[in-house]
Structures are given as structure tokens and as C-alpha cells.
A protein has these predicted regions:
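N-terminal helical cap/lid subdomain that shapes the substrate entry/recognition surface
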Residues: 7-17, 22-101, 107-108, 122
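Short, flexible active-site loop motifs that bind/organize anionic cofactors or intermediates
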Residues: 43, 72, 92, 114, ...
């Protein structure tokens, strides 16, 4: 787990940020590259046809939150080998896309920031560096950090989040999960945390051609925004500001 000094101490909200399609547009070029690498890995290791491997990759992502967990459970693959092979990054200047002024937007959010990603550290940290936002994150929790003695874990695993909240001393009422993946928001909101659904980086269709939902605001989403800029604006005025203030009062009743 990578740590940096907190910029805001222990007061105020705590933001648990997803990485891909939340802080940058992974669907532009990085996700297609990773998806191809994952499918090729499955073809090579399991000896299945390309189409079957592609369906397996998508199915495990939907069922377990990460392809890795399905491959471990059903095929006993080497997790470290898998993560190393399928998360090789090209030159980031060629593929990285993010909001203009993202460093200023992240820095301007009140409270602590923790990265919570199902990606490995050797992938996540260079992206944070390239975006110029690594120093704004007090913790960077990768999929390796989510594992325990019993099993590898990934969002939306309940045991993983429960241990993270305890380890970091986070009050659920003032903890906000910022995600593009609705299923993660839905499952983890049961802990009493608040949820932000960010939709601006979502592709129109997923890798199998299915339309990605982005309309409406499900009951388990507290704030829906298209961008970090919109999130900042909603926290300055309006309903977003009221929700953050209400969460702070709930966690500090005195």
C-alpha cells in the first residue's frame, strides 16, 4: 500500500476514488489494450477459442468485480503473472485522457483522498504520476492490497471494504465512494458510505457491444455527475453541499 502525508488531517469527508473511467478515460485506449491482453492470456493458458475467452473475461468481470478473481477461483492461475502480463502500459502521453485541470480539481476537494482500484500498483501509480495527482492521495490501495491471508479480493467485496474502513479509521457516514461502476456503488453503499456515480468517461458500449447505462440516478447513488468539475461545483452549492454537510453532522454529532 502506497502512502503519502494527508493534506487535510482527519476532519471533513473522505473520498475513496476509483481510477479507470473515473479519474481518466481508460475506455479511450488503455482498456481496449488491456482487454486484448486478458483475452490473449486466457487463450494461451486455458487453451480455449478467442470468442470463448472474450466471453469468459467479460463474465468474470461482471460476476467477481475483476477477471483475476474468476481465473483464480476456476482455473488456479498465477495471480502475479496475470497482473504483470496484462497491465503493461504503453507510453502514457500517447493514450492518457483526462479532464483539463484535473490536478487542481482533485486538490480542491475538501478532505482526505484514498485511491481504491482493482488494478495493480505497477499500473495505477504511473497513471497517478502522469496525471499529476499522486501527491493528493494519502493512500493508494491496489488489488494486491485488498488480498488477505484467505483470498484475493476486489471491489465490491464486503470484507475488503470493512477491513479498509477499520484500518484507516473511516467513519462510513463521511466516506464517499466515487465510481463509474454502478454495481460497486450498489453493493458497498450497504456499509453506510455515500456514493458518487461519475459518468463522463463511460463508453457508449462495453467491450461486448452492450449499451452502458448512464441515464437516471439509481436509489443507491447519492450524487450523480459527469465530471470532477461538476462534482466540485455541486459541493460548492446545491444538493451536493447539503449532503456532505449532513454526512459530517452524522459522523460528528457533538
Amino acid at each position: 500500500m502506497h502512502r503519502a502525508r494527508s493534506e487535510h488531517g482527519t476532519r471533513g469527508p473522505v473520498w475513496l476514488f476509483d481510477l479507470d473511467n473515473t479519474l481518466h478515460r481508460a475506455s479511450h485506449a488503455i482498456f481496449p489494450r488491456i482487454n486484448r491482453a486478458m483475452t490473449a492470456y486466457i487463450v494461451e493458458k486455458l487453451g480455449v477459442a478467442h470468442d470463448e475467452a472474450n466471453l469468459m473475461r467479460a463474465s468474470y468481470t461482471e460476476r467477481y468485480g475483476a477477471v483475476l478473481l474468476g481465473l483464480i477461483r476456476h482455473h488456479a492461475i498465477d495471480p502475479h503473472e496475470f497482473l504483470a502480463q496484462v497491465h503493461e502500459l504503453p507510453p502514457l502521453a500517447d493514450v492518457l485522457r483526462a479532464e483539463r485541470g484535473i490536478a487542481r480539481l482533485v486538490a480542491g476537494l475538501p478532505g482526505r483522498k484514498i485511491l481504491l482500484t482493482n488494478a495493480p500498483a505497477h499500473y495505477a501509480m504511473p497513471i497517478l504520476e502522469a496525471l499529476g495527482i499522486r501527491r493528493h492521495f494519502e493512500r493508494c490501495v491496489s488489488i494486491e492490497d485488498m488480498a488477505d491471508r484467505r483470498a484475493w479480493r476486489a471491489k465490491p467485496d464486503a470484507t475488503m471494504l470493512r477491513r479498509l474502513l477499520v484500518r484507516e479509521g473511516l467513519a462510513p457516514a463521511r466516506t464517499w465512494l466515487v465510481e463509474d461502476t454502478r454495481s460497486h456503488l450498489k453493493h458497498l453503499r450497504h456499509f453506510g458510505i455515500k456514493t458518487v456515480w461519475i459518468t463522463g468517461h463511460l463508453p457508449i458500449r462495453n467491450s461486448l457491444g452492450k449499451v452502458m447505462p448512464r441515464s437516471g440516478r439509481p436509489h443507491y447513488v447519492d450524487i450523480k455527475v459527469q465530471s470532477l468539475r461538476e462534482l466540485r461545483a455541486s459541493l460548492a452549492t446545491g444538493e451536493g453541499a447539503k449532503r456532505v454537510a449532513r454526512a459530517a453532522r452524522q459522523s460528528n454529532p457533538n
